[in-house]
């Protein structure tokens, strides 16, 4: 099928391109005439939510994005942060939600491919990947099929490309039944004096197309990613791109080789809206026009129209502004790697975006208004509604030991081994901590002691209950997970997944979550350096849980002192850093209430950022001085789940006392923030206690390691083997069932 280049512009056609009547009026006023069909497609791609951030830009500007280590914040392909010694880490997280629901394998695979390109476009070699996945209820007929396809797609692309997957999340909730989330993170290493940007410079310079050929896959993908779903979703399958990780690996090597020659003035990967977005962004950032001749674009399908070529989202492609004298040298590199190299246009001084096809001018538009001066909205939002606290007599009871077994074997708290064993976690040979701990850790090649830690976090049920506190908590938990390895948290990337921003109650979630994220990042010196917004995650008016995923990076100065979650040996002292007087108090929005009693009421836990910082800095100091033997942050499932995970990771049991005269349920299952379980060798307990007192950090002794069971207070002991069996069984049992019908 080919799309005609001369279709009449009708209200239905305008609406099908995701443009509102007032936006179309704005186009008419801007260009003084009716747009051509190709121009309509270009406006649709550049002015949609996915490319323009028109609903969120106002609020994103409020986030803290600067810091002493920040080399490049938001606005480029990825953020860049200094990690000393002339090295920097380049990273970003981005969603591929809508495509992954329609076509799970290719949607997830190209999500990984896209984020890897964002990183190596900046001149960095990718060293780590993570993915945060959210699926519908396990008993929904599509869920198993989607899990299987997405996990295979993530693994298939990342493994073949050759980047280790070191962390991530997998969560189930009925609110994702119609819209799953696939948030992909990648990080790479570069030299601080060799970072490449997308801003075009110089007039009359060649614009070069690099990589794979252009096909019809993904035409209209960015527009599809900015729309709600309805019953016609299956018809959108052709808008999903198809990826080839081996071509991408060649593209990586060719780009890095080319970058060493001094030939590259500006470079931009072709992601959402393909050739359109990459050309417009390069030109608009550099205050230059761009002229493209589509007859020179390498294609793999016959009779492609200008519309299709401009909006194709074929993968593994780059656009570059090149030094003309380096043309032959550059071409030789790409030919060597078996990739296309074609001069498809030039930079101009007239701020116009001109497209030529078969001798005709099919588009001539103002480039700034397409790019950095696209429409921006201040959408209405409602005041936040926060649930009232639970009454003290409204904490339902359950057997503490039975609850522990039930939770470790539940859909959302069980082992994710089935998932991450499909990913290559060790490729490149630098992985120090694998999925299953608080954070993934990767050695920095060329340095004896330096490593980087990575974590991805958000608790959507908290954000739903209180978007402001939930936004704070996502940042705080990410910061805490990095700290728990001994890393100094450096910076973060945010992936904001929400429903339809035209609904004031959804816009309210987005606004308050961003406010919470900003406040936490400010307080924790954890700036946001890159990110992505995914809106319209709704099907038939049912929105997802608000899910502002935070991906963070931390610096480990000496990985030989790095902490892990597993108990080291028996007969060590267990302490709870940052504990309130009764160790745990907050049961609202806990997994205990949700998974044991089916209740989702009550407020989200409060995040005291000063407390969070004080306790985290204290724990990191203990790790750096070699005074603790294991560390694990307390999050979902509270103290009980944290201790159980430490026991399961090591095979060593634990006996935990219980503070007298306090209800055991909030003590063990409360989800108070800013707490870490730490173990200390007996000879170091006094030193650690003295340091805690000096720092003003609560550090009660709560128990001892040893034995082959976990005993919580007066509850019966539960053997580590029983916990492991329950923990490891859920995922393989679920996925081993007959595949649910794909309908």
UniProtKB/Swiss-Prot annotation:
Segments passing through the bilayer: none
Annotated InterPro entries: PRibForGlyAmidine_synth_PurL, PurL_linker, PurM-like_C_dom, PurM-like_C_sf, PurM-like_N, PurM-like_N_sf
Pathway it works in: Purine metabolism; IMP biosynthesis via de novo pathway; 5-amino-1-(5-phospho-D-ribosyl)imidazole from N(2)-formyl-N(1)-(5-phospho-D-ribosyl)glycinamide: step 1/2
Gene3D superfamilies per the UniProt record, alphabetical: PurM-like C-terminal domain, PurM-like, N-terminal domain
Entry's localization field: Cytoplasm
Molecular function (Gene Ontology), one example: ATP binding
EC number: 6.3.5.3
Keyword Secreted attached: no
Binding residue positions for substrate: 95-98, 117, 241, 313-315, 534
Pfam families: AIRS, AIRS_C, FGAR-AT_linker
Active site location: 50, 96
Binding site for Mg(2+) 2: 118, 269
Keywords from the UniProt entry: ATP-binding, Cytoplasm, Ligase, Magnesium, Metal-binding, Nucleotide-binding, Purine biosynthesis
GO cellular component: cytoplasm
SUPFAM superfamilies noted in UniProt: PurM C-terminal domain-like, PurM N-terminal domain-like
Binding residues annotated for ATP, in chain numbering: 53, 92, 494, 531
BP terms from Gene Ontology: 'de novo' IMP biosynthetic process
Binding of Mg(2+) 1, residues: 94, 532
Catalytic activity: N(2)-formyl-N(1)-(5-phospho-beta-D-ribosyl)glycinamide + L-glutamine + ATP + H2O = 2-formamido-N(1)-(5-O-phospho-beta-D-ribosyl)acetamidine + L-glutamate + ADP + phosphate + H(+)
Major subcellular site: cytoplasm
Subunit organization: Monomer. Part of the FGAM synthase complex composed of 1 PurL, 1 PurQ and 2 PurS subunits.
Family: Belongs to the FGAMS family.
The protein's role, per its UniProt record: Part of the phosphoribosylformylglycinamidine synthase complex involved in the purines biosynthetic pathway. Catalyzes the ATP-dependent conversion of formylglycinamide ribonucleotide (FGAR) and glutamine to yield formylglycinamidine ribonucleotide (FGAM) and glutamate. The FGAM synthase complex is composed of three subunits. PurQ produces an ammonia molecule by converting glutamine to glutamate. PurL transfers the ammonia molecule to FGAR to form FGAM in an ATP-dependent manner.
Name of the protein in question: Phosphoribosylformylglycinamidine synthase subunit PurL
Annotated organism of origin: Sinorhizobium medicae (strain WSM419)
């Amino acid at each position: 099928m080919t799309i005609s280049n001369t279709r009449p512009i009708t209200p239905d056609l305008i609406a099908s391109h995701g443009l509102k009547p007032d936006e179309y009026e704005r186009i008419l006023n801007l260009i003084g005439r009716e747009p051509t069909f190709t121009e309509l497609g270009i406006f649709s791609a550049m002015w949609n939510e996915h490319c323009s951030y028109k609903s969120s830009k106002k609020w994103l500007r409020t986030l803290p994005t600067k810091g002493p280590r920040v080399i490049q914040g938001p606005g480029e392909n990825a953020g860049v942060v200094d990690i000393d010694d002339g090295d920097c880490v380049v990273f970003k997280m981005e969603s591929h939600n809508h495509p992954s629901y329609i076509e799970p394998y290719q949607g997830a695979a190209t999500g990984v491919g896209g984020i890897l390109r964002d990183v190596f476009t900046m001149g960095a070699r990718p060293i780590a990947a993570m993915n945060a996945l959210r699926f519908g209820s396990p008993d929904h007929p599509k869920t198993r099929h989607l899990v299987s396809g997405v996990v295979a797609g993530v693994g298939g692309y990342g493994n073949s490309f050759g980047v280790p997957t070191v962390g991530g999340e997998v969560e189930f909730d009925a609110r994702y039944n119609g819209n799953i989330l696939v948030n992909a993170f990648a990080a790479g290493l570069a030299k601080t004096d060799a970072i490449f940007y997308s801003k075009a410079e110089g007039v009359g310079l060649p614009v070069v197309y690099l990589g794979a050929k252009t096909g019809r896959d993904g035409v209209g993908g960015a527009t599809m990613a900015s729309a709600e779903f309805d019953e016609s979703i299956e018809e959108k399958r052709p808008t999903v791109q198809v990826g080839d990780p081996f071509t991408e690996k060649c593209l990586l090597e060719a780009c890095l080789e080319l970058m060493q020659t001094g030939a590259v003035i500006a470079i931009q990967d072709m992601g959402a809206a393909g050739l359109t977005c990459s050309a417009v962004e390069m030109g608009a950032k550099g205050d230059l026009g761009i002229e493209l001749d589509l007859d020179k674009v390498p294609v793999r399908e016959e009779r492609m129209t200008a519309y299709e070529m401009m909006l194709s989202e074929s993968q593994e492609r780059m656009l570059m502004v090149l030094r003309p004298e380096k043309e032959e040298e550059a071409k030789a590199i790409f030919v060597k790697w078996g990739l296309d190299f074609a001069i498809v246009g030039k930079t101009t001084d007239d701020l116009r975006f001109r497209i030529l096809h078969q001798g005709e001018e099919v588009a001539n538009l103002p480039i700034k208004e397409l790019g950095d001066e696209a429409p921006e909205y201040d959408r209405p939002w409602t005041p936040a509604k926060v649930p009232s606290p639970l009454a003290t007599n409204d904490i339902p009871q359950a057997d503490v030991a039975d609850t522990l077994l039930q939770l470790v074997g539940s859909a959302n708290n069980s082992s994710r081994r089935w998932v991450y064993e499909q990913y290559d976690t060790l490729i490149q040979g630098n992985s120090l901590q694998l999925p299953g701990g608080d954070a993934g850790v990767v050695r920095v090649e060329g340095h004896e002691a330096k490593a980087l830690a990575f974590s991805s976090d958000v608790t959507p049920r908290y954000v739903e209950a209180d978007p402001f506190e939930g936004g704070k908590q996502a940042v705080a938990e990410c910061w805490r997970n990095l700290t728990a390895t001994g890393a100094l948290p450096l910076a973060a990337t945010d992936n904001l997944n929400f429903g339809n921003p035209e609904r004031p109650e959804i816009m309210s979630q987005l606004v308050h979550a961003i406010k919470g994220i900003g406040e936490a990042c400010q307080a924790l010196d954890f700036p946001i350096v890159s990110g992505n917004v995914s809106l319209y995650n709704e099907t038939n008016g049912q929105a997802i849980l608000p899910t502002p995923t935070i991906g963070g990076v931390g610096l480990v100065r000496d990985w030989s002192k790095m902490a892990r979650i597993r108990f080291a040996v028996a007969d060590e002292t267990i302490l709870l850093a940052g504990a309130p007087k009764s160790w745990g108090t907050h049961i609202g929005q806990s997994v205990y209430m949700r998974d044991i009693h089916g209740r989702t009421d009550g407020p989200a836990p409060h995040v005291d950022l000063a407390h969070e910082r004080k306790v985290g800095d204290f724990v990191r100091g203990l790790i750096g001085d070699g005074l603790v033997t294991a560390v694990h942050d307390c999050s979902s499932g509270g103290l009980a789940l944290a201790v159980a995970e430490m026991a399961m990771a090591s095979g060593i049991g634990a006996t935990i006392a219980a503070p007298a005269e306090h209800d055991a349920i909030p003590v063990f299952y409360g989800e108070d923030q800013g707490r870490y379980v730490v173990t200390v060798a007996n000879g170091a307990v006094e030193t650690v206690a003295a340091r805690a007192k000096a720092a003003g950090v609560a550090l009660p002794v709560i128990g001892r390691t040893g034995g082959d069971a976990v005993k919580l207070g007066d509850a019966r002991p539960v053997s580590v083997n029983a916990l492991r069996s329950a923990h490891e069984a859920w995922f393989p049992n679920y996925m081993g069932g007959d595949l649910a019908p794909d309908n």
